[in-house]
């Protein structure tokens, strides 16, 4: 089980990323625009740098909903590989079963 502080930190990052997504996209659009002047691009760049660091979506880490494990998480289920296996064996995941051939 992951430390609860790490889980809460990730939740905070997800909220910040969602909150600043529109602003961040608008500034990035200005930076990648061919029509924007050099001064506009510099201004957009400084505004982007002044946004909270945790508002960047690349700082958010997918975690298992049950254990908080940061690696080996299946996006489709939101569970880590160990918890997904346990849930599958208990029959909690509909349509999923152990392979045998």
Swiss-Prot record:
<comment type="similarity">
    <text>Belongs to the universal ribosomal protein uS14 family.</text>
</comment>
<dbReference type="GO" id="GO:0019843">
    <property type="term" value="F:rRNA binding"/>
</dbReference>
<comment type="subunit">
    <text>Part of the 30S ribosomal subunit. Contacts proteins S3 and S10.</text>
</comment>
<keyword id="KW-0694">RNA-binding</keyword>
<dbReference type="InterPro" id="IPR023036">
    <property type="entry name" value="Ribosomal_uS14_bac/plastid"/>
</dbReference>
<dbReference type="GO" id="GO:0006412">
    <property type="term" value="P:translation"/>
</dbReference>
<keyword id="KW-0689">Ribosomal protein</keyword>
<dbReference type="InterPro" id="IPR001209">
    <property type="entry name" value="Ribosomal_uS14"/>
</dbReference>
<protein>
    <recommendedName>
        <fullName>Small ribosomal subunit protein uS14</fullName>
    </recommendedName>
</protein>
<dbReference type="Pfam" id="PF00253">
    <property type="entry name" value="Ribosomal_S14"/>
</dbReference>
<comment type="function">
    <text>Binds 16S rRNA, required for the assembly of 30S particles and may also be responsible for determining the conformation of the 16S rRNA at the A site.</text>
</comment>
<dbReference type="GO" id="GO:0015935">
    <property type="term" value="C:small ribosomal subunit"/>
</dbReference>
<keyword id="KW-0699">rRNA-binding</keyword>
<keyword id="KW-0687">Ribonucleoprotein</keyword>
<dbReference type="GO" id="GO:0005737">
    <property type="term" value="C:cytoplasm"/>
</dbReference>
<feature type="region of interest" description="Disordered">
    <location>
        <begin position="32"/>
        <end position="65"/>
    </location>
</feature>
<dbReference type="GO" id="GO:0003735">
    <property type="term" value="F:structural constituent of ribosome"/>
</dbReference>
């Amino acid at each position: 089980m992951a430390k609860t502080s790490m889980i809460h930190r990730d939740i905070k990052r997800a909220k910040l990323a969602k909150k600043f997504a529109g602003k961040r996209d608008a500034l990035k659009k200005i930076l990648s625009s061919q029509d924007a002047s050099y001064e506009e691009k510099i201004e957009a760049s400084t505004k982007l740098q002044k946004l909270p660091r945790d508002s960047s979506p690349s700082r958010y880490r997918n975690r298992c909903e049950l254990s908080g494990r940061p690696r080996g998480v299946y996006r489709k289920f939101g569970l880590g590989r160990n918890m997904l296996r346990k849930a599958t064996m208990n029959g909690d995941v509909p349509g999923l079963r152990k392979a045998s051939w």
